[in-house]
Amino acid sequence: GMKILKLLLDEICETFDVPYLHIGTDEVHFTNPQFVPEMVAYVRDKGKKVISWNPGWKYKAGEIDMMQLWSYRGKAQQGIPAIDSRFHYLNHFDTFGDIIALYNSRIYNADMGSDDLAGVIMGIWNDRLIDKEWNMVLENNFYPNMLAIAERSWRGGGTEYFDKQGTILPVDENSEVFRNFEDFESRMLWYKEHLFKGYPFAYVKQTHVKWN
């Protein structure tokens, strides 16, 4: 099995001129304790850095180049750069609610990146075959969410982590949280009109809506 996998890795590394290769390691039972370390070493010998899921294979600093955190159990480790994907699976989202939480969320509950916090990735993990590919972009609100997480990752900060009450805007329209999202919403709608015209951009203004 390892011999065949190495042949596949040869083909992948020859085909894709990229600096990183993600090798997975989540949701599987390992019977050979040398399997993952040998695969990591093999990919590194190809001149590429290796990413692995967490939870997944248990690494120490220096044994892997980067970890991608998934599920609530994903934890960053000192000495290993981490990508936060834990609450960023868009197919789990509510279209008009969770973009607020995404915009307000502190990535890995930190103010800014560091040597141990490399950034964030959003994912669309649809489990069903969809007739039209663009439906995934539309139904998962991809472009608005992309702009929300891009701004948060570029600017840092945020008010809380995604798993708290951030899907609801404050009632007080003068609060900093409300005004910040209102400002972002205005700029996002400008992008919708000017740069995403003709693309499936599933968002309309909502900060003016009052709920009783």
Regions found by a protein language model. Give the residues of each.
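Flexible, acidic glycine-rich loops studded with aromatic residues
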Residues: 60-65, 70-212
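Active-site neighborhood of glycoside hydrolase catalytic domains
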Residues: 1-66, 72-77
